[in-house]
């Protein structure tokens, strides 16, 4: 998982889901797990 400043480009990818956990924003992509990231 990468830690990124901006998730805007990742959430446009096909299969991307934006999820909030414990006040942090995550992008999870089951189609392409390379694009899994947390905002920080």
UniProtKB/Swiss-Prot annotation:
Protein name: Large ribosomal subunit protein bL36
Similarity section: Belongs to the bacterial ribosomal protein bL36 family.
Keywords (A to Z) from UniProt: Ribonucleoprotein, Ribosomal protein
Record carries keyword Ribonucleoprotein: yes
Leader sequence segment: none
Gene Ontology molecular-function annotations: structural constituent of ribosome
GO cellular component: ribonucleoprotein complex; ribosome
Entry's Gene Ontology BP terms: translation
Domain of life: Bacteria
SUPFAM superfamilies (UniProt xref): Ribosomal protein L36 (SSF57840)
């Amino acid at each position: 998982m990468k830690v990124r400043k901006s998730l805007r480009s990742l959430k446009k990818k096909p299969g991307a889901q934006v999820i909030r956990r414990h006040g942090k924003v995550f992008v999870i992509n089951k189609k392409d797990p390379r694009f899994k990231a947390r905002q920080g």
